[in-house]
A protein has these predicted regions:
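Glycine-rich flexible loops
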Residues: 1-441, 453
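Short, small/polar-rich loop/turn modules that mediate ligand/substrate recognition or access, typified
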Residues: 522, 609, 614, 685-687
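Substrate-binding pocket helix/loop in short-chain dehydrogenase/reductase
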Residues: 532-533, 540-542, 656
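Active-site helix of classical SDR
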Residues: 556, 593, 601
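Alpha-helical segment proximal to the catalytic Tyr-Lys
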Residues: 561, 606-607
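Residue(s) in the substrate-gating loop at a strand-loop-helix junction
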Residues: 577
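C-terminal substrate-recognition "lid" of short-chain dehydrogenase/reductases
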Residues: 664-692, 697
Length: 702
């Protein structure tokens, strides 16, 4: 590992944050250097601090310690992420023999110099007790590898040298802070302190020294491990492992089943669904097929901090069956075994510790599947990604540890204390989840005005959305509009032709592989052609039928195996048309195709109810879109209708507004609201038609 400290960059940081004290700007700079190195910290892990002398509001001298806020990501930390606290009263806490979690939390909060700052890191007292101006802390993989080895302290001393203090694992808070301060004072010229199963602390009176000591000692650990592993085969594959016929298809099927097996009723009665992440690179696939795979899954986290993201252990799937029923049986069996073990550990720990705790959900977050690789689940896509990053680093670290010596896991007691520590749980937050969080929504015709309106409402309510269209340019434009407003984390896109079942089926498999499955399908792709029957070319009729009828058939058909494997129900909301009940002259192909698709959707409602899948239809009318994204249908029919009525574009919009009973201008977002209603399962409804047209009497469902 090399130092990335650059004087020019450091000066640029000082200039960028010119209103801050220089020491604080430099603290931000090296904090980001640490945060951007995933071999040092992952997703909010690690922490840094700096001590400054300043004036308080009364003009009195005051020493402040700025510590990274709890859960703040070092990679992107801003000034607000460093929490300033009055140092003197914090240091006096060192005289205490013990302090409750609640009292420590309160002491940290009342010492903040800005009441609106986030909560400081749980390591804040440790940073306060250490005398050096700068303190850096990381969960470096290579350091943790050595701490997990039998005779770990011996390995650490040989690897790191004499100027490093080594402590056994101590729970974060006052006990660890006092122990670190004591060993710092006891050892002369100490440059770093390692806490077993926890990580490494480095320090210095200037920012570069503290940072580069971190890099230096982590580099020593890496070199030591590399030397010990030289010439050894990292992975020994299991014998007689059945090869997969189609890796990507197997991965898609498997995540559907995992996702469904792990779904459970939430406190509000809704179904808690999951997103998945698949890591199937060469290294993860090799480990999944190895003799050590099952043992790695059972040997726990690298550091107790990780347990709130990944649980302590992972599930190992020795085989991914080509038969869906057999696959579901094996996954269900493995998940139930995990839950039973989790429940047993929880009961055992609360009994031994004589405490009362509310049990968290017992579902696994990490799976290792033979031949597939790593799969993680999360209640948000970000949570699934975080779990995947941590699990991937954990598996690689355990593989390296194998080459050095015997790997020793952390005790269940220590992991339990961290998982059920109230101050650690705060990192996860307690906010009420959005209405559709956990759902994957697939929208065809995603490049048009209605597709945009539907996607926007689904994203606003927390769903992950996959925009699908045959027109890549229009799809890209809609994606850009939505990502600007909502970001990319819950937004995906796929390009395919709904009339081509094979490519569509492959696209749905890829959507499953990327997100876990499908909960909401919105068949919205459609085309139109204006011609009286006498003038309507048969091939044009066939073309409209192919997209509007066969396309609807294809997407519904392709979704059924996904819904079946998940076993958690779902919704199909077909974007139909006012023309189903109120057709127009010279619009025969469109009206007939929409009416046929509408009838097909009713049949789907009859057939899919046994899977818990509801099928409903939305009948919009006169959705024009806007200047950014127009309606393709109105691009086609609008000119002829303006001409026949002597209207300009705005006049045509007004004509259709005045035509409906409510005199309402119907927008794409109104269609989106209807889709959200059906997707949220607020009523036990299937086979229904919901007009979104302002009230057109001739189009009343009947």
């Amino acid at each position: 590992m090399k130092s990335l400290f650059n004087e020019k960059e450091a000066r640029a940081f000082v200039g960028k944050y010119g209103s801050l004290p220089e020491a604080l700007s430099l603290r931000l700079y090296t904090s980001r250097l640490i945060g951007k190195n995933s071999n040092l910290v992952l997703h909010g892990g690690g922490n840094t601090s700096v001590k400054l002398k300043t004036k308080n509001i009364l003009g009195e001298d005051q020493e402040i310690v700025y510590v990274k806020g709890s859960g703040i990501d070092l990679a992107t930390i801003e000034p607000e992420g460093l929490v300033g606290m009055d140092l003197s009263p914090l240091r006096r806490l060192r005289t205490l023999q013990a302090i409750s979690d609640e009292d420590m939390d309160n002491q940290l909060k009342i010492r903040k110099t800005n009441a609106l700052s986030p909560d400081p890191s749980v390591e804040a007292l440790l940073h306060a007790f250490l005398p050096p101006r700068y303190v850096d802390h990381s969960h470096a993989d290579s350091i943790l590898v050595l701490t997990h080895l039998k005779d770990g302290e011996v390995h650490l001393r040989e690897a790191l040298g004499p100027r490093v203090g080594i402590l056994p694992y101590i729970h974060s808070g006052l006990p660890l802070a006092k122990a670190v301060a004591e060993i710092y004072e006891r050892i002369g010229a100490v440059e770093a302190i390692v806490v077993l199963y926890h990580g490494i602390f480095t320090f210095g009176d200037d920012v570069r020294t503290s940072y580069e000591r971190m890099i230096e000692y982590v580099s020593r650990a890496e070199s030591y491990i590399k030397k010990r592993c030289a010439g050894k085969s990292p992975v020994i594959h299991r014998k007689k492992i059945k090869p997969l016929k189609d890796h990507r298809s197997s991965a898609s099927r498997m995540v559907n089943v995992i996702r469904g097996t792990c779904a459970f009723p939430a406190a509000d009665g809704s179904l808690q669904r999951w997103y998945t992440v698949v890591r199937d690179g060469t290294e993860m696939k090799d480990i999944s097929r190895s003799e050590e795979a099952e043992g790695m899954c059972g040997s726990g986290v690298l550091t107790p901090d990780h347990t709130i993201r990944t649980k302590n252990r992972a599930v190992y799937l020795r085989e991914v069956s080509e038969d869906d029923e057999e696959l579901r049986k094996k996954v269900s069996q493995s998940v139930n075994q995990f839950k039973t073990a989790y429940d047993h550990t929880f009961s055992e720990q609360v009994k031994k510790k004589r405490i009362a705790r509310e049990k968290l959900d017992p579902y696994p977050r990490v799976f290792l599947a033979a031949g597939i690789g790593l799969v993680t689940v999360g209640m948000t896509r970000e949570a699934a990604r975080v779990a995947a990053d941590i699990a991937e680093h954990t598996l690689m670290a355990k593989l390296r540890a194998k080459g050095v010596g015997e790997y020793l896991p952390i005790s269940d007691s220590d992991v339990f204390d961290m998982e059920y520590w109230s101050l650690q749980q705060k990192k996860l937050g307690k906010t009420v989840p959005p209405l559709l969080q956990g759902q994957v929504a697939v929208i065809t015709g995603g490049g048009g005005a209605i597709g945009l309106g539907i996607a926007e409402q689904l994203l606003a309510h927390g769903a992950a959305v996959v925009l699908c269209d045959i027109d890549a340019a229009r799809l890209k434009k809609v994606h850009s509009i939505l990502s600007t407003k909502y970001g990319d984390s819950n937004l995906e896109q796929a390009t395919f032709d709904v009339t081509d079942f094979k490519s569509l089926d492959q696209a749905f498999a890829e959507i499953s592989r990327r997100l876990g499955g499908i909960d909401l399908l919105v068949p919205n792709a459609g085309i139109a052609h204006v011609a009286r029957i006498e003038d309507l070319a048969p091939e044009k009729f066939d073309q409209v039928m192919a997209v509007n009828l066969k396309g609807t058939f294809n997407v519904i058909k392709a979704s059924v195996p996904v819904f079946r494997r998940q076993g958690t129900g779902g919704n199909i909301v077909v974007i139909s048309s006012k023309n189903v009940f109120d057709p127009g002259a010279a619009f025969g192909a469109y009206s007939a195709s929409k009416a046929a698709a509408h009838q097909l959707s009713k049949v789907a409602a009859l057939e899919l109810a046994e899977l818990g899948v509801r099928v409903n239809m939305v009948n919009p009318d006169a959705i024009f879109g806007d200047a950014e994204v127009s309606s393709r249908l109105w691009e086609l029919v609008g000119p002829e209708r303006m001409k026949s009525r002597g209207l300009d574009p705005e006049g045509l919009r007004e004509y259709y507004r005045q035509r409906n009973l409510l005199k309402a201008r119907v927008l794409a977002e109104h269609v989106g609201n209807a889709v959200v209603f059906f997707a949220s399962d607020q009523t036990p409804t299937t086979g229904a038609t919901l007009p979104v047209d302002g009230g057109v009497p001739a189009a009343f469902p009947r």
